[in-house]
Swiss-Prot record:
Belongs to the CutC family. The gene is cutC. InterPro entries: CutC-like, CutC-like_dom_sf. It comes from Yersinia enterocolitica serotype O:8 / biotype 1B (strain NCTC 13174 / 8081). One of its GO terms (molecular function) is copper ion binding. This is PF03932 family protein CutC.
Amino acid sequence: MTKLEICCYSVDCAQIAEKAGADRIELCCGQSEGGLTPSIGALMQARETVTIPVHPIVRPRGGDFCYSDNDFAIIKNDIARIRDMGFAGVVVGVLDIDGHIDMRRMREIMSVSGSLAVTFHRAFDMCQNPMIALQQLADLNVARILTSGQQQNAELGLALLKDLVAATQGQGPIIMAGAGVRLTNMQKFIDAGIRELHSSAGRTVPSTMKYRKAGVTMCADSDVDEFAHYCVDGEVVEAMKSLLVMGAPLPQSA
């Protein structure tokens, strides 16, 4: 059966996703950056309160995936901490200046990771040649690849996703479709033979604050609503899981 991983930007979201039936959590912070390494406090709380597998992302900054020596040292230190805390896996990815998998650094990462299941994240979508990258990641014994098929969303990348699944032939990394995977389009990925789906399944949640200071923001983008935040929608996760488990019909509306 196809597995459902939910991207969570807080422990609250992870708890909602678990209760709704998610198979696994990718734990992040920094939604506006596309996902950054969660804090030590978030990692500790997740270990204490979430029972399904949690795979924290290790990404020290936003932007590209070609890292300085300091960035890379931070990545290895964070992975070692995640390993020692007993997490099931980790999500990471490193490229070189030419848009290829940085094999030297990835070998170091695999060594530090130990028994952690390593997901190579959407840095894969920034690679020059996805088929060469697939073989390199297979050689590294990476557990899975999170990818949109090198497109802005996974539905647009469905052709490459199918090619990647065919190339693995049930061997090597699991191909996990992510970016724009929703209840209304997930059947397309299931029909393509994709074994794992990654979704944020989220909604905007209004702040509980009654007093709201006007004219002051904590973000450089003054248009951002700071009295709202993004969180997992448990009902959506339940519906997605229901489709996977029972083959429930898709809703007619988008």
